[in-house]
């Protein structure tokens, strides 16, 4: 009996189990590859997108920054990772970008101006985006003095996110891909560019919905409609009441 057990053990393969074949480009399993939805050839733009990515974003299973990188010509979207910028891994390259007068930072501060009002004829521009949750983005900004010197811009008309399989904080929150695509559509004066670059996200969401995922509403929507499953504090409750009152006055 014991000898048979040892024979069974010897017969077990030492090789790791076979995993699903993955696409070389998007690194997704082939059956859920969104590469066919990418623009072919990649979009040629004069602007450049620089993404400062919080390390936690790299762990997310559904990341959209790669969609942007593959949807644009090589070098038109670069990603730097960290919690403070520049850092020892990217100091020289990123510092040159941050020192350029043509570099803009998308950040909703008091000093930010609508991207639509920037003089597009003075371009091309490099647009810096911070990729992370809002608390992560604020922490990156606070710990990166080099970002404080950049001209700051914001998007006015953002609409509702198409990333419907992920819960967004508010109705106006967009994924990294959607944000960059909208900015490029403005900077390049090509409104159709947003839809073209976001197409892989639509493909991803459709596959997930077809295979059991559910469509998500934003936390703001759930809270305003008394559908949020967790208790909220008095401060947030008061803010929501005031927002509702302001909305009623406008209508």
From Swiss-Prot:
GO cellular component terms given for this protein: cytosol
MF annotations from Gene Ontology: metal ion binding; tRNA-uridine aminocarboxypropyltransferase activity
Disulphide-bridged cysteine pairs: none
Keywords per UniProt: Metal-binding, S-adenosyl-L-methionine, Transferase, tRNA processing, Zinc
Motif DXTW, chain ranges: 131-134
Binding positions (Zn(2+)): 23, 26, 33, 35
Pfam assignment, any one: DTW
Name of the top EC class for this enzyme: transferase
GO biological process: tRNA modification
InterPro entries: DTW, DTWD2/TAPT
Notes on the domains: Contains 1 DXTW motif.
Role description: Catalyzes the formation of 3-(3-amino-3-carboxypropyl)uridine (acp3U) at position 20a in the D-loop of several cytoplasmic tRNAs (acp3U(20a)).
Name of the protein in its database record: tRNA-uridine aminocarboxypropyltransferase 2
Source organism per UniProt: Drosophila melanogaster (Fruit fly)
